């Protein structure tokens, strides 16, 4: 795709193409009827990044055509949230005539929320000084006086200045219950807030009749762990990225959930620990006895590369497997192994990325009789 063509008239057509493609891809696995979860037709992305172009006294956002690499001016971006679109012109207008804020500015990143908070990161090809800090504080005050709930980060080489927080607090509604999530700049969060809510509701529905405990690999900031905790006695969740683990702990406390335990381990390390091949000090320090857990269900949301063979083999040891995938190609590869022992009993498409080829899929697998 050369440029993102956000055309609501085409939304249903592009969704139908994805439905057909996903059904064709997974037909060999005897999947049930596909459950389809639509996105808003525009203003669905909670984050966006733009390069900044300096032209005389003018200053504006640009993006690049992916095929020709030619730049084009962006004043509004229909894929991004209304909050980002509302802020874009006011931010650039406020910086245009301010030498300290605009000098060697080359990129602006926005992280917004359904809750109304927004975080702006300004990236520079120069070191930032006291003058920049004073001007950035004034910019923040000016924009918040106009009704925004905004924080600013200034970034340069080996430098990060935070005014006043480097995160936003998101609130996602799951079947009428609100969950609080800390989302930190530069760490992974679901890009499409409304579809993220639908994914959580689907996962909760799939595990409604569960017994025992839940094991979750690749838990990020606890996005799924918190919503799923209601369906299980206990949740044991693993994540390798330290900032995500810190956010997950924050989110557990903020939501007053007392049956979720987060461990900083990779999926591969957890496999070694559960099979008794290796001991981890982190488990002892956290006071976690893996043998005390009775996990019948495992939840995985791996990176685009999917799960390695050893992790797939370990996952096969559970009665029920819930798998969220941002790359159906690697989901297929993993199902070649998982379907030796399990049947797919639920199958879903989440349109996280409208007007692109990307598809987010979910499957529930249950052990063959």
From Swiss-Prot:
UniProt xrefs under InterPro entries: MeTrfase_TrmA_AS, MeTrfase_TrmA_CS, SAM-dependent_MTases_sf, TrmA_MeTrfase, U5_MeTrfase_fam
GO cellular component: cytosol
Top-rank EC class of the record's enzyme: transferase
Pfam families, alphabetized: tRNA_U5-meth_tr (PF05958)
Active site per the UniProt annotation: 326, 360
Example GO molecular function: rRNA binding
Source species of the chain: Vibrio campbellii (strain ATCC BAA-1116)
NCBIfam families xref list: trmA_only
Role: Dual-specificity methyltransferase that catalyzes the formation of 5-methyluridine at position 54 (m5U54) in all tRNAs, and that of position 341 (m5U341) in tmRNA (transfer-mRNA).
SUPFAM superfamilies on file: S-adenosyl-L-methionine-dependent methyltransferases
Gene3D superfamilies: 2.40.50.1070, Vaccinia Virus protein VP39
UniProt key word S-adenosyl-L-methionine: yes
Known EC number: 2.1.1.-, 2.1.1.35
Name by which UniProt lists this protein: tRNA/tmRNA (uracil-C(5))-methyltransferase
Lineage, highest ranks first: Bacteria, Pseudomonadati, Pseudomonadota, Gammaproteobacteria, Vibrionales
């Amino acid at each position: 795709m050369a440029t993102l063509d956000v055309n609501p008239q085409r939304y249903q057509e592009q969704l139908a193409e994805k439905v057909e493609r996903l059904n064709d891809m997974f037909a060999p696995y005897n999947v049930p009827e596909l459950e389809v979860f639509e996105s808003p037709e525009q203003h669905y992305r909670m984050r966006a990044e733009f390069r900044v172009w300096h032209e005389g006294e003018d200053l504006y956002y640009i993006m690049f055509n992916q095929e020709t690499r030619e730049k084009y001016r962006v004043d509004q971006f229909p894929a991004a949230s209304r909050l980002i679109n509302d802020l874009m012109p006011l931010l650039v207008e406020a910086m245009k005539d301010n030498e300290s804020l605009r000098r060697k500015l080359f990129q602006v990143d926005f992280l917004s929320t359904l809750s109304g908070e927004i975080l702006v990161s300004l990236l520079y090809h120069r070191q930032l000084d006291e003058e920049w800090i004073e001007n950035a504080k004034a910019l923040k005050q000016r924009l918040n006086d106009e009704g925004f709930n905004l924080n600013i980060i200034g970034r340069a080489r080996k430098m990060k200045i935070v005014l006043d927080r480097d995160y936003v607090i998101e609130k996602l509604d799951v079947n009428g219950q609100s969950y609080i999530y800390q989302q930190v700049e530069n760490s992974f969060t679901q890009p499409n807030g409304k579809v993220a809510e639908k994914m959580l509701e689907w996962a909760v529905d799939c595990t409604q009749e569960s017994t025992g405990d839940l094991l979750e690999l690749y838990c990020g900031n606890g996005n799924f762990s918190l919503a799923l905790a209601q369906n299980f006695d206990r949740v044991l969740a693993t994540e390798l990225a330290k900032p995500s683990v810190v956010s997950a702990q924050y989110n557990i406390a903020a939501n007053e959930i007392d049956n979720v335990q987060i461990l900083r381990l990779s999926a591969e390390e957890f496999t070694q620990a559960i099979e008794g091949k290796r001991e981890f000090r982190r488990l002892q320090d956290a006071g976690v006895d893996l043998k005390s857990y009775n996990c019948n269900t495992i939840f995985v949301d791996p990176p685009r590369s999917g799960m390695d063979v050893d992790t797939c083999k370990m996952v096969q040891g559970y009665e029920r497997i819930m798998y969220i995938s941002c790359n159906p190609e690697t989901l297929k590869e993993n199902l070649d192994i998982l379907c030796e022992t399990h049947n797919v009993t639920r199958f879903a498409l989440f349109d996280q990325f409208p007007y692109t080829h990307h598809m987010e899929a979910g499957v529930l697998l249950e052990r063959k009789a």
